Amino acid sequence: MPAEGSLAQEFVQFAVESGVLRFGQFKTKAGRMSPYFFNAGLFDDGAKLGRLAQFYARQLLAEEQRSGLAFDMIFGPAYKGIPLAAAVAIELARLGRNLPFAYNRKEAKDHGEGGTLVGAKLQGRVLIVDDVMSAGTAVRESIALIQAAGATPHAVAIALDRQEKATENGLDVEHSAVQYVTRQLGLQVCAIARLSDLLQYLSEKSDSPSGGETLDGQRLKDHYQSVLAYRERYGVN
């Protein structure tokens, strides 16, 4: 489910100002040339990561009120999901919701506690926390790990839903990775913001007297048409 409008717009502005959401020409995993790029790895200091966790927590608590979303613990898939899961768990605890969290290693450890899982025991309804969902590979791998541990994959929280067609065998299909996870795998997906929110942000900045200058001095209105054209070519509803 998408975030409430003002929260989504606030998040998009934060991502742009932090340099996490950038504009230009970027090649995606699917081989497309995208006019924007969301790099969650650039939430790279305590203040930015802490604020990012606040957005996740606000969206999750809002979704709890809106749809009854409930979960018993948090799981972060390696690698980007690891700090996200920890940060979101800290923020939820600060807000009075103290939940266990866990994550996985890419490589199994053959000494100490061993295995690929670290943190709390996977049990109950598990929320998977990641940055974006391009092909859904990390989510499918997480689902397999969670089920193998005897727990239930219940929902996924991401920062940005790109709202674009997924690919299968190198060909575009008429659904996004998020829609596949929702419809075929039966997991609720909560996104802080979507591509439609980014377009709204760019449109509103384009109409401002300043033309919406970014941190590098470029005008955001210069990117609106390219992002819109990308959405029209590859987008899903």
Curated annotation (Swiss-Prot):
The keyword Protein biosynthesis does not apply. Catalyzes the transfer of a ribosyl phosphate group from 5-phosphoribose 1-diphosphate to orotate, leading to the formation of orotidine monophosphate (OMP). Its EC number is 2.4.2.10. Keywords: Glycosyltransferase, Magnesium, Pyrimidine biosynthesis, Transferase. Orotate binds at residues 37-38, 134, 162. The gene is pyrE. This is Orotate phosphoribosyltransferase. Homodimer. GO terms for cellular component: cytoplasm. Its cofactor is Mg(2+). It catalyses: orotidine 5'-phosphate + diphosphate = orotate + 5-phospho-alpha-D-ribose 1-diphosphate. It comes from Polaromonas naphthalenivorans (strain CJ2).
